[in-house]
């Protein structure tokens, strides 16, 4: 096939007549190299040193051109401090393929690059190394290009330098031109084969970290899908690996035990320069260890101490130089291997082409019917064809390559089956979710706070069980029709996994239905209990909690029998689990009732004041009490106060159990005027979770109530004193008033105006007396006199002559008026 031009898919501007397209390309390239637009660098580029020259000599001593590797590293104290916290990266690729240019852009190095004006000769000789990054956390190796004319057919040096890079690098980049993909020599596949073999031989005695190989496809073409390029390269790699003869302990080891592979691509450097720079800057992020998508994962780190890197590199290079195990197989074996491999590749390609229709079906998301029958037949035909064509070659090689071909074919079918299984799993998962959701939506309609019947849920429990059985049966049949015989053992786990997922989905649906049923029951029972206990909370009687407990016990006995029946018929719960769920449900309902009591805390001051007034300020008929001299105010006051504080004590604790009645949260005093106080610590045996009013709330409420109690008590004493006055007027005083006021009495009777005025004033006084308003009138008169006197004194105080005198007999008292007003109120 003709070689594809690198500029085939790009459009060039018209060229000057005096320059050829080649000349202009060279000019553009040189200008790009010398242009300041190349890369914006935040620090001085690192030139690095040549650690292995073109003759294979290691930089173990200083020369006039460069220091030794040891001294170079010692001059980088920031690198020495890193210990093993750094990463190494190298690059492989053909000569003059832009490896050094790529490294310079990625790592801010200054490796020597190609100048086409001087010819396409070798620019990198041997191996160069530089430290990159602000903290010198990346070691960069620039390797001499492969397939160069300078070394002609001598491949041993490039193999050794490649193997050297594998031994020290966490990440190894392989620089490929896109048009070289698929070419065994041009794409360095022959070199990779040698690298794989020697890698196993050199490190067979120790467990070494894996190496990440990153293929960088240069000058990508627009009409070639990158996914296809990636697949082609991986197919080449897997074919190479299948031909590698590993040591005995690694016979069955897959390639990913030793290597991981990733792929990326870049546009043409000259024709799409700005796109190239932009994508290289994106690629830089992959080489940032702090990036979550970094190439520098811990499993790739070779864990070589920074201060021992120079010694390690020198020793490993000497080991590679002295390696004697690079001889090729015998000619006959080589011919057999080559031809069998070629035939195997051809048959594999034909097989791959023959199943493209099935691949398209799977790619579109459709399932292949009779997958097992279709692909088993094709694999058998391909292996039979291979035997016919290779019967003249070495039997051992034929059998070996046949086994490899069978693995490849089965691997390809296995990859297709993975997609088939993925689609089947997705379809069955969608079906499970859809059918279970339909059932869930149906039983959700049963929710009704006014009614609860567990038997209605039993119907949907049976429907869930039937649906699960049908889906499992269909899944088994579909799986058996799709799994080839050679995948039977491998796919058992997948089959069991899906069956497990179906079971999990079923158990989840049953659990959700049980939860809905339990929530339905809880809401139903709460809506039944709360209206029945609310009147007891409002009544504030001593038997409040007893009545509440009676209501709850009755409803619990009747209700939880239904819930237990629902658990038994609608779920697979055992006896202990059912008891546990019922216990949780009871706790939830009791907590909801407790919340109802807690919400009434804001009404508690009003309820307690009303309770005190009903007992102290009102009589048995509900009328305001008229205090007589013979009434025992103290006894009634303490009785009302004790009763009120008992109500407060009931609200302090959630007394849902009969044993809770024993706990006391307030202390009543009878000596002097000491106020009641709340107990600071919980009574012994009390549950803190049941406390409704904490100590601070109780204390604040009691202080408020004490003020209210004392005001009521003082008012009662004053009314009692007023009522005693009318019984204390002497009889002789009445006779003297009548005797000396007789003339005035006759004058009033004979004067109509005075008589009417006397009747009005007397009637008012009588009504006030009957209504016990004497104290109010007295206070009001005192208030008027006090205000008048205060106003007069304040006016006289403004006159300088009277100010000293007024200050002596009438000192300022801003609270005097306020206290009088408060007394009147």
From Swiss-Prot:
Record-annotated GB1/RHD3-type G domain positions: 83-305
Protein's UniProt keywords contain Nucleotide-binding: yes
Top class in the EC scheme: hydrolase
Regions that span the bilayer: 729-749, 753-773
Topological category with respect to the lipid bilayer: Multi-pass membrane protein
Main location: endoplasmic reticulum
This protein's GO CC annotations: endoplasmic reticulum; endoplasmic reticulum membrane
Any GO BP: endoplasmic reticulum membrane fusion
Keywords recorded for this protein, A-Z: Coiled coil, Endoplasmic reticulum, GTP-binding, Hydrolase, Membrane, Nucleotide-binding, Transmembrane, Transmembrane helix
InterPro entries noted in UniProt: G_GB1_RHD3_dom (IPR030386), P-loop_NTPase (IPR027417), RHD3/Sey1 (IPR008803), Sey1/RHD3-like_3HB (IPR046758)
Lumenal-side positions: 750-752
Localization per Swiss-Prot or TrEMBL: Endoplasmic reticulum membrane
Domain of life per record: Eukaryota
Positions of region (Disordered): 1-21
GO molecular function annotations of the record: GTP binding; GTPase activity
Cytoplasmic topology ranges: 1-728, 774-825
Binding site for GTP: 93-100
The enzyme's E.C. designation: 3.6.5.-
Coiled coil: 373-397
Biological role stated in the UniProt entry: Probable GTP-binding protein that may be involved in cell development.
Family: Belongs to the TRAFAC class dynamin-like GTPase superfamily. GB1/RHD3 GTPase family. RHD3 subfamily.
Protein name: Protein SEY1 homolog 2
Species annotation: Entamoeba histolytica (strain ATCC 30459 / HM-1:IMSS / ABRM)
Organism taxonomic ancestry: Eukaryota, Amoebozoa, Evosea, Archamoebae, Mastigamoebida
């Amino acid at each position: 096939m003709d070689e594809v031009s690198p500029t085939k898919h790009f459009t060039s501007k018209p060229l000057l007549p005096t320059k050829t397209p080649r000349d202009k390309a060279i000019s553009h390239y040189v200008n790009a190299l010398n242009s300041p637009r190349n890369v914006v660098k935040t620090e001085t580029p690192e030139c690095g040193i040549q650690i292995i020259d073109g003759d294979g000599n290691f930089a173990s001593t200083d020369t006039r051109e460069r220091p030794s590797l040891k001294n170079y590293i010692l001059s980088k104290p920031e690198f020495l401090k890193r210990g093993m916290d750094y990463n190494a990266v190298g690059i492989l690729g053909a000569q003059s393929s832009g490896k050094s240019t790529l490294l310079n852009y990625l790592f801010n190095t200054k490796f020597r690059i190609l100048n086409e004006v001087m010819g396409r000769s070798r620019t990198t000789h041997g191996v160069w190394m530089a430290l990159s990054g602000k903290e010198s956390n990346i070691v960069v190796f620039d390797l001499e290009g492969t397939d160069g004319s300078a070394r002609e057919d001598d491949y041993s040096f490039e193999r050794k330098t490649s193997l050297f890079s594998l031994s020290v690098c966490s990440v190894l980049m392989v620089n490929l031109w896109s048009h070289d993909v698929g070419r065994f020599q041009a794409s360095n596949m022959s070199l990779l084969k040698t690298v794989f073999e020697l890698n196993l031989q050199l490190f067979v005695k120790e467990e070494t970290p894996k190496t990440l190989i990153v293929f960088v496809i240069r000058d990508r073409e627009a009409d070639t899908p990158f996914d296809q390029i990636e697949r082609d390269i991986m197919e080449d790699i897997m074919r190479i690996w299948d031909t590698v003869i590993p040591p005995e302990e690694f016979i069955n080891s897959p390639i990913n035990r030793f290597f991981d592979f990733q792929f990326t691509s870049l546009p043409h450097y000259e024709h799409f320069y700005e796109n190239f720079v932009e994508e290289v800057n994106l690629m830089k992020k992959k080489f940032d260890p702090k990036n979550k998508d970094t190439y520098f994962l811990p499993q790739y780190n070779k864990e070589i101490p920074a201060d021992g890197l120079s010694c390690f590199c020198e020793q490993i290079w000497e080991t590679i130089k002295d390696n004697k195990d690079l001889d090729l197989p015998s000619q006959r074996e080589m011919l057999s291997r080559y031809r069998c491999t070629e035939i195997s590749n051809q048959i594999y390609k034909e097989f791959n082409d023959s199943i493209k229709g099935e691949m398209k079906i799977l790619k579109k998301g459709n399932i292949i019917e009779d997958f097992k029958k279709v692909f088993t037949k094709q694999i058998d035909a391909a292996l039979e064809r291979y035997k016919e064509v290779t019967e003249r070659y070495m039997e051992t090689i034929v059998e070996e390559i046949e086994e490899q071909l069978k693995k490849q074919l089965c691997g390809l079918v296995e990859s297709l089956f993975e997609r088939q299984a993925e689609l089947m799993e997705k379809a069955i998962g969608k079906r499970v979710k859809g059918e279970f959701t339909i059932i869930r939506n149906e039983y959700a309609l049963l929710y009704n706070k006014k009614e609860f019947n567990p038997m209605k849920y039993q119907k949907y429990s049976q429907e869930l069980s039937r649906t699960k059985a049908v889906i499992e049966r269909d899944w088994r049949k579909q799986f058996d029709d799709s799994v080839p015989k050679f995948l039977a053992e491998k796919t058992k786990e997948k089959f069991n996994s899906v069956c497990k997922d179906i079971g999990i989905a079923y158990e989840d649906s049953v659990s959700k239905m049980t939860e809905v049923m339990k929530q339905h029951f809880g809401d139903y029972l709460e809506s039944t209990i709360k209206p029945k206990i609310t009147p007891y909370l409002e009544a504030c009687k001593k038997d409040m909690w007893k009545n509440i407990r009676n209501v709850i016990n009755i409803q619990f006995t009747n209700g939880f029998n239904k819930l237990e029946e629902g658990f038994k018929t609608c779920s697979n719960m055992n006896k202990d689990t059912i008891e546990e769920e019922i216990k949780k449900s009871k706790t939830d309902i009791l907590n909801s009732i407790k919340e109802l009591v807690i919400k009434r805390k804001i009404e508690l001051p009003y309820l307690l004041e009303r309770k005190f007034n009903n007992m102290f300020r009102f009589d048995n008929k509900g009328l305001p009490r008229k205090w007589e001299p013979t009434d025992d105010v103290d006894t009634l006051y303490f009785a009302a106060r004790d009763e009120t504080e008992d109500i407060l004590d009931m609200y302090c604790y959630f007394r849902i159990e009969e044993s809770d009645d024993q706990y006391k949260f307030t202390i009543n005093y009878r000596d002097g005027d000491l106020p009641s106080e709340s107990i600071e610590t919980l009574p012994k045996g009390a549950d803190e979770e049941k406390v409704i009013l904490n100590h601070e709330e109780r204390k604040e409420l009691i202080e408020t109530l004490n003020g209210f109690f004392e005001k009521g008590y003082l008012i009662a004493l004053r009314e009692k004193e007023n009522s005693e006055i009318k019984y204390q007027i002497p009889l002789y005083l009445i006779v003297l008033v009548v005797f000396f006021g007789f003339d005035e009495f006759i004058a009033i009777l004979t004067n109509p105006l005075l008589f009417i005025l006397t009747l009005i004033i007397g009637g008012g006084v009588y009504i006030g007396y009957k209504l016990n308003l004497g104290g109010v009138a007295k206070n009001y008169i005192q208030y008027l006199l006090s205000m008048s006197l205060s106003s007069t004194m304040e006016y006289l105080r403004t006159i300088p002559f009277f100010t000293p005198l007024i200050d002596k007999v009438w000192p300022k008292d801003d609270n005097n008026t306020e206290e009088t007003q408060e007394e009147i109120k």
